[in-house]
Amino acid sequence: MIEETLLEAEEKMDKAVEVAKEDFSAVRTGRANPGLFAKVMVDYYGAPTPLQQLASFAVPEARTLLITPFDRSALGDIEKALSNSEVGANPSNDGNVIRVVMPELTQERRREYVKIVRGKSEDAKISIRNIRRKAKESLDKIVKDGDAGEDEGSRAEKELDGLTKTHTENIDELLKRKEAELLEV
């Protein structure tokens, strides 16, 4: 039961790190990146549909993104969704593809994005700490119920602390890389 609890905690912590990676990739850096549009929803035939399901992406230049819809009738809907998104993109529709040129980021905007990324990083760490707390409660209950000995419980707790530390360090490393990417001019 202890191993199952630790394995479950590790899987949840891995998921928290993955979510942080996705959140970080959604913060723009001045370069074109299809991940920026991961959460853009298009009103396609009356149903909100993720942009990735409607089009393919190409990055021909550092600040240009080409979006090629699988169905050309969706061009207008995609362009409208991009214009209304929080990405700050300026789409231009040439009838076949949508070209998005990412504007240069000002230093002030870069600092705002760094704050946003730090907030997302802290959210991920809080999530990891909550996972640790719940796993520790489960471990304590297992020991209290007599399903495992005190020694096993303390060994598992140390392993849980190691997992927490490793995953928190992963978040810190992701944050450091994203900050460097954002502040690079």
From Swiss-Prot:
**Places the protein is found:** Cytoplasm
Q: Which domain of life is it from?
A: Bacteria
| Record flagged with keyword Protein biosynthesis | yes
For this protein, the record's SUPFAM superfamilies field holds: Ribosome recycling factor, RRF
Protein keywords? Cytoplasm, Protein biosynthesis
Give me the Gene Ontology terms describing cellular component.
cytoplasm
Write down the Pfam families for this protein, in alphabetical order: RRF
Q: What does this protein do?
A: Responsible for the release of ribosomes from messenger RNA at the termination of protein biosynthesis. May increase the efficiency of translation by recycling ribosomes from one round of translation to another.
Protein name per Swiss-Prot or TrEMBL: Ribosome-recycling factor
Q: Say which species the protein is native to.
A: Renibacterium salmoninarum (strain ATCC 33209 / DSM 20767 / JCM 11484 / NBRC 15589 / NCIMB 2235)
